[in-house]
Design a protein with these regions (language model features):
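His-Asp phosphorelay/catalytic-motif detector in bacterial-type signaling
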Residues: 45-47, 73-78
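Acidic, metal-coordinating helix/loop segments flanking the phosphotransfer/catalytic sites
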Residues: 30-48
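Active-site residues of response regulator receiver
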Residues: 52-53
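Alpha4 helix (beta4-alpha4-beta5 surface) of REC/receiver domains from two-component response regulators
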Residues: 60-63, 85-108, 115, 119
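Two-component/phosphorelay signaling modules centered on CheY-like receiver
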Residues: 11-29
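Short amphipathic alpha-helix used as the core "switch/output" element in two-component signaling
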Residues: 39, 62-75
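Conserved acidic carboxylate
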Residues: 8
């Protein structure tokens, strides 16, 4: 069973995604901080990461994505960047224009449609 690391500081979002992911036969580990996410990444075999961009308590998701992709041990792990940044800030992110600067495989805007999420995961994991 493929293992997904889901990182978000919103516990409600994590719980909703966990139900969706487990229903689709994925093993899910969760982190509400970047620090905990790093510890999980070091100790478990992760197949895919879902990462919130704007984390309130820690370094943001952009920095964590760069850490993952610059590390030989983890750079093969696909990352889905999940965010509401376009809804809650004046910063407007456009994946077509700005995506080349991000070390992630997919950008998905919250709220994420469950069917789109599963289809994206299957595509990234080549299932």
């Amino acid at each position: 069973m493929k293992k997904i690391l889901d990182i978000d500081d919103d516990i409600d979002v994590l719980e909703a995604r966990k139900i969706i992911l487990e229903h689709s036969n994925y093993d899910v580990v969760q982190a509400t901080t970047i620090k905990v996410a790093g510890e999980i990444l070091e100790s478990e075999e992760i197949d895919l990461i879902i990462l919130d961009v704007m984390m309130e308590k820690d370094s943001d998701g952009f920095n964590f994505a760069q850490y993952v992709k610059m590390n030989e041990k983890f750079k093969h792990i696909p990352i889905i960047l999940a965010t509401a940044v376009n809804q809650i800030s004046k910063f407007k992110f456009n994946i077509e224009e700005d995506g080349n600067f991000l070390p992630v495989e997919k950008f998905m805007e919250k709220p994420i449609d469950p069917d789109d999420l599963i289809a994206t995961i299957k595509g990234l994991l080549k299932e």
